[in-house]
Amino acid sequence: TGLRIGPATAKGLALALDKPIVSVPTVDALAYNLWGCEDQVCPLMDARRQQAYTGLYTFSDGQMQTLLPQCAVGIDEITAKINESGKKTVFLGDGVPVFADYLKENLQVPYLFAPAHCNKQRAACVAVLGGILYRQGKAEDAAAHKPDYLRLSQAERERQEKARDFRI
């Protein structure tokens, strides 16, 4: 719900002030907490039901490179991708304590868990990444802005389920 309120507030302010919006992906911003890290970075946000909001990133030449764009996947799927990459990986986010035991048992690559102070979103990282995206021309008209939700809300899922049951 909070992630839905934020974009609605930003859109309202941008419309009132006639300003563009720069959409900063949540998982990208979390990865940016580890800017300059030499290892592969994997943010993990607990999406419940053994799923994580996640992605894969590296930093080179002073820039963040997206290897796997933010997505909602099972912890088994992201673990398999990391094992396939063969790269040492640093994990961060509120999903680390949730999935730590699974990762310890199933990772076949060297890994680290980032210190606790890196596991929360930082306004400074969102702002810096937003500035980079703005300079890359990724601002959009506030009226046209639609948030990029990685999965349907619970209310939307329940509505679809009821509609599906009604059709049967």
Predicted regions: what is each one?
Residues E161:
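Oxyanion-binding "anion nests"
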Residues P20-K120, R135, Y149, Q154, ...:
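Surface "functional belts" at beta-alpha junctions
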